[in-house]
C-alpha cells in the first residue's frame, strides 16, 4: 500500500533527499535578516520562489553559500534535511528528528546527520544552541527547574537550562528524548502553548504584557522569548513516540547516509587515502550486515557509526602503518564481548585481509611495534622504538602560561613507575589520541590493571594538570 502511494521510502522518498529538495519540491535559496528577531527565507521552486519571514536568533547569520566552510559536508541529503527543517520552522513548529525506518535501501548504521543539521540550522538563523542530554530518571520538574543552595545554606529553586533558553530565545536541542518515555509529554504546554508553570506562582508565557528580560522574577508572570525553538532527537523509534508526542512536535525522519556519501564524507573529514581505507570499508560493510541479523549475536555489540569511522580514518591519515586490526578491535570493545561474538569479529577481520601485526605470515609479516621508555627532551615528549628510531614527538603542555594555578595538580610518581613494553605501547596510543587527535578517552579495564598509574604517568610526562573526581553509584548528574 505504501509503495502504491509512493510513501514506501518515507515522506518525499529517497529521490527527494538525493535531489536536495525539501517538502513539496522546495529548496532553500537565501536567508536574510530583517530585524533583530526575524529573518526572511527564500525557497526556490519550479513554480516560483516563496518568501517567508521567520523568527531568528541574535547572532550573525551565516550565509548559505559558506556553510561548506563550517567543517561539514553539505551533501544533497543534508541540504534536503536542512530545507525541510526551515520549512517546519516557518510554520512555527518544534521538530522531532528520528532516523528513517521505511526505506529498505538505506538500512545501515551510518549517521543520519541529525546533530550536524541542527548546528547548520542554528548557524543559518543566528541561534545559540543549548544541548540538553537526557537520561532515564529525569522528571518533568527537573527539566524546568532544579534545587540550589545559597551561600547561607538555604535551598531555593533556580531555572533549569531549558527554562533559561526559553527566557533568552535560544535553540534547544533535546538529545535522546526516547529515554524519557511518558515524561516527555510533560513539555506539551511549552511546545504547544508556549507557557511554563514554575515555582511559587512564577509563570513564563509569550503572551505576557511585560518587557523581555534574561532573569525570572519570583511570583510574577514573565515573558518568554517568542523566537525560542525546540528540536528533539532520538536514535530510534518506539513506544515513546505516542499520539501526544506526535502532536507536540513535527516529526522529521532523517535517512542515513548512503555508502557513497559516507565514504566521501569520511575522506573529506580525515584526508585519508583511498587504498588505506579500502580494507576498513570492507570490514564495516560486513560488520553492519552481520549486526542486523539477531541470530549472529552482533546485534548487542557496539554499532559502527560514521563518527567512529572518521576517528579511525584520521589515525590512518596521520599514521598509515598503524595496526588496523588493533584499532578496529579496540573500537568495537571486543575484549568485553562474549568469546563467541569476539571470534566472529576476529574472523571477519581476517576475511577482509586485516590481521594483527606479527601474524600476517612470512611474506606479509609486519613486526609489532615495541617501544623503549618515553623521553622528555627540549620541551617535548618523544617515543622511540627499541632500535632508537623516533616514532612520535609531541610538545609538552605549557602550564606556566595557560594554567599557572594548575601546577599543584600535575601528577608526580616520584620515580615509582617502571617501564614495560605493553604499558609504554598503551601510553603511546593514549598520547596519540589525547594530544595529536584531540580526542576524549575512556580507559576501561579490570581493577588492579594500572589504569590510574598509567594515566598519571602520561600526564606527568606531558606536564598536564589533572583534576581527579572519584565517582560512585550515588553521584547524580547535578552533583557532577
What does each model-identified segment do?
Residues 94-134, 440-472:
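Walker A/P-loop
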